[in-house]
Amino acid sequence: MSSQADIIKPDSRIVVQFSCGAASAVAGKLALAQYGDTHDVQFLNAYLANEHQDNRRFLADCEVWTGRKITVLRDEKYGADVLNVFRRERYMKGRTGASCTKLLKRRLLDTWKRPGDVMVLGFTAEEEHRLDDFRERNPDRPVIAPLIERGLGKEDCKAIIARTGIELPAMYRLGYEKESAA
């Protein structure tokens, strides 16, 4: 595996994949702290029509916390709607992942990326296998995972957000592990 020094070049954009969850918020804040003075750090969000409306409040709160505008991208083909993807594609999850993630998030984000971009993913210490799977499926896509690098788990991220005074998204308060269906 390459080191960050091998992955991140002086002209790389650092692109945070912001999902409106605690982990991606903390991963983005850590990336901004580490690279904000030397690189163009961008925050991107793929809007989902089916997500809880409180995610937009959390996104706005995180814009204030990070001091950065979060660019929101919206799929047009499927209306940013997970159910439309399932109806048209006729599967939920295959060997390469969930169809909604691929079509409503990854493909959309791919249209925005530039060569040399380094993705920041909010995989937590408990999700190292997801990072390994991602790297295996995307060997040409440079990616860093600040939470795994620092041994931070889901509960750590929730606690960090709580200490900022930002209220966690409603889906957490309703008892779900994540802010989305993914």
What are the residue ranges of the model-derived segments?
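Nucleotide-activated chemistry modules centered on ATP-dependent adenylation/adenylyltransferase
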Residues: M1-A182
